[in-house]
Amino acid sequence: MPHSKIKERFPDAILEVTEFAAEPIIHVKGQHNLTVLTALKSDGYNFLADLTAIDNLTLGGYERFAVAYHLLCHASAQRLTVKAYVPEKELSLPSVESLWKNADWQEREVFDLYGIRFEGHPNLIRIMNPHDFDGYPLRKDYPRLGRKERSDFPVIKRPFKKEKRTE
C-alpha cells in the first residue's frame, strides 16, 4: 500500500500525511495506531527502527503527546514515520510489542520518561528510573533542575580504584 493511499484506506484513523526531508509522516489518531501499524507491517514495513515520544506542550499540534514510530521497509529501503497522538487525559496507546519485539524496551522507556501507558504490554515497568520515582522527567512541564530527587538516588561504588601512573 503506498503511503499516499493510506488515508483512503483508514479515513477515520488518519489525520493527515505530510513529508519532512523527503520521508513521509503519517499522523494517526492514537487509538488506531495498532490497526494502521499492523497494515503497514503487512505491506512491507517490517522493521521498527525506533519508537519515541514527543511532548508538544509548547509546540501545539493535534494533542500534547505523540508517539513516533520510525519504520523501514527492507525490500525497498523506504523509511516512514507514524505519529500517533495521545490525548493528555488518557495517556494510553495500544502496545505494538506483538508486532515488533524490539518495541518492548522502547515502550517501557517512553512510559518511564513520559508516563504514556501501552495497553497490552507484557511488562510495563520503569526501565531507567527507580520504581518509586515520582514524575516523568522528559515532559516539558517537569522542572529543568529536577525536584531534588537526585539526592535520594542510591550511590553506586566503583569496584576498583584508578591506578596512579608511574613513569
Name these PLM-found stretches.
Residues 1-167:
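Terminal low-complexity/charged segments
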